[in-house]
Regions:
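Active-site-proximal loop/turn and secondary-structure-junction residues that shape catalytic pockets
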Residues: 8, 41-43, 82-86, 151-157, ...
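Surface-exposed, active-site-proximal loop segments in enzymatic domains
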Residues: 8-16, 42-60, 86-98, 111-120
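Glycine-rich anion/phosphate-binding loops
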Residues: 12-23, 50-68, 125-132
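Acidic/histidine-rich catalytic cores of soluble enzymes
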Residues: 112-179
Length: 179
């Protein structure tokens, strides 16, 4: 089984179309494998949803289309994240055998500037997520697609002025209780 993280699919109009998703699935199947999941769409497909921006409702409509198209293309799982400022890393670290590994050093990362227009509160981010979940979950159920959410990476409280919600088991429990 194959999972693609943010596949390079044309995002005309801020959404993925059915034909491109079917082509991707068929391409994987040509090699005797199964495309089981897509993890993440480009952040600019849903950043206004995460931050309650002026294009939130437009992006929700586009994401509804995208989720429907993923399901209708025969891809059973869609994973996403709630990190509008992406995964954070600091310079790589040398590990056993002299290999280099990705790293995050909070002493460095916590000093980085704001990534968006202002600081956001954790409750704002939860309210935005709740709004999204109550809309997208019934769509996913209707289409027979499963949703997954990526943990905050790194799992620290806040980076660049944006709270990182999924850093604990309690956060996942809170998510499940929304819908």
């Amino acid at each position: 089984d194959i999972l693609f993280n943010t596949p390079l699919i044309s995002g005309d109009g801020g959404k993925w179309n059915l034909q491109d998703l079917v082509k991707l699935r068929l391409r994987v199947e040509q090699f005797g494998m199964k495309l089981t999941a897509l993890e993440n769409v480009p952040t600019n497909f849903y950043d206004h949803i995460m931050l309650n921006g002026p294009r939130r409702d437009e992006q929700i409509e586009n994401m509804i289309s995208t989720v429907r198209n993923i399901a209708r293309a025969g891809i059973p799982i869609f994973g996403y994240n709630w990190m509008p400022s992406h995964v954070w890393r600091t310079p790589p670290k040398s590990i056993r055998g002299g290999a280099l590994a990705t790293a995050y050093d909070h002493a460095l990362g916590s000093k980085y500037p704001l990534t968006h227009d202002r600081e956001y509160s954790e409750e704002e981010m939860w309210a935005n997520l709740e709004y999204w979940i109550k809309i997208i979950t019934p769509i996913a159920e209707e289409e027979g697609i499963r949703l997954g959410i990526h943990p905050s990476d790194p799992p620290v409280p806040i980076l660049g002025g944006i709270p990182r919600l999924f850093r604990s088991f309690a956060a996942y429990k809170r998510l499940i209780e929304i819908y």
